[in-house]
Design a protein with these regions (language model features):
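Residue-level recognition of specific faces of alpha-helices
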Residues: 65, 78, 117-120
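Short, well-structured N-terminal submotif of metal-dependent ribonuclease cores
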Residues: 1-34, 40, 44-61
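Short, polar loop motifs at secondary-structure junctions
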Residues: 16-19, 113-117
Length: 129
């Protein structure tokens, strides 16, 4: 794989836990993008960690290797569309994951994730890494 990829929090956490197969995929990918929402989730996890200093250092180091995507008006529009479609289908997903899916759709990036509920989002290219 050599294409650009948007990373869900689950992928970064697996990388932090030294998932060798995943690390290889990350190394073979093109540009790596991280939603601002996922970065917030990573910081939350680091601050809750028993080894806070090490966890924060991991987040800071990883932050250097990715491009952080920030939500804007177009993201909000995608968010509204996705949330409406999922509500009508009776398949809601967590709030933060709605924002992550919206960024993936807005930027037309495949989303590497380990959460099955992303598959409910129409038109979202989910990579189950």
């Amino acid at each position: 794989m050599n294409g650009n990829v948007l990373l869900d929090t689950t992928i970064v956490v697996a990388h932090f836990r030294r998932d060798a197969a995943l690390t290889t995929k990350l190394q073979q990918a093109g540009a790596l993008y991280l939603p601002l929402t996922a970065l917030g989730e990573l910081y939350y996890g680091a601050y809750r960690s028993q080894n806070q200093a090490k966890a924060l250092a991991q987040v800071h180091e990883f932050f250097k290797a990715v491009v952080v995507l920030h939500p804007g008006e177009a993201t909000a529009d995608c968010y509204g569309q996705i949330k409406t479609e999922l509500a009508q289908a009776g398949t809601p997903i967590p709030q933060n994951d709605l924002w992550i899916a919206a960024l993936a759709k807005e930027y037309q990036l495949p989303l590497a994730a380990r959460d099955d509920h992303f598959k409910c989002v129409q038109g979202l290219n989910v990579l189950n890494w």
